[in-house]
Amino acid sequence: MKKKLNDVTLIAYDTRPDKIEGTILGMQKCLSRLDFASAKLLTDIEPKNLPDNIIWEYAPHINNINDFNLYVFSELGMHVETSHALYVQDHAYILDETLWSDRWLQYDYAGAVWPIVENSYLTDDGKRIRVGNGGFSLRSRKLMFAPRVLGLKLEQRQGFFNEDGNLCVYHVDKLLKYGIKYMPVEEAATFSYENPVLENNYGNMKTFGFHRNHRENE
């Protein structure tokens, strides 16, 4: 019998025609492993033959990566009624449901550990941030609405707007003062994989989920 996460909404957002089928498949893989309060696919046009266990909700067309990042940064929470959402993509979904821990719901944000890269993932005062990647991420409603509540703007750095960088690095001090809790690096290494780092035994450790770059550890 599958475990049900009553406080978690499974959610994905993509409007690119060549990605919709894969996104639905990624959601179905998650739903085959765990049950959720609901599963929502956000697109600009309702897909034909959408599985009955996935709810369609309108979200604006993505013209470029900046459109995507702005919507996830400031609007994702409008689609979530539960305390948390698990954000997934066509290349980011659950691998091993047995690794899920209800303890994770104490955190407002969880994502894969970022590698140590010179001049990257640094706050303005030079603090290095390791958590984390937004492609497969657990987010609380408090976190999702924080940009609206605090009046945070999506900042452009490294040539484009990245919503996870804004939430975890650029605005981290304001969000910490607001009470946002980020998953510690050691737990994040079990939560999700994106890049080989010391904390995940350079990719040789099983993880709950992944974002890109990973063979399925099934």
Q: Locations of the language-model features?
A:
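N-terminal anchoring/stem segment of glycosyltransferases
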Residues: 1-84
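Short glycine-/acidic-enriched loop or helix-start segments at secondary-structure transitions
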Residues: 51-52, 96-99, 148
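Basic, ligand-binding patches in group-transfer machinery
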Residues: 60, 99, 153
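Short beta-strand-to-loop acidic/aromatic patch adjacent to the donor-nucleotide binding site
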Residues: 82-94
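Conserved donor-nucleotide/metal-binding helix-loop-beta segment in metal-dependent transferases, i.e.
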Residues: 93-125
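Catalytic core and acceptor-binding pocket of nucleotide-sugar-dependent glycosyltransferases
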Residues: 129-218
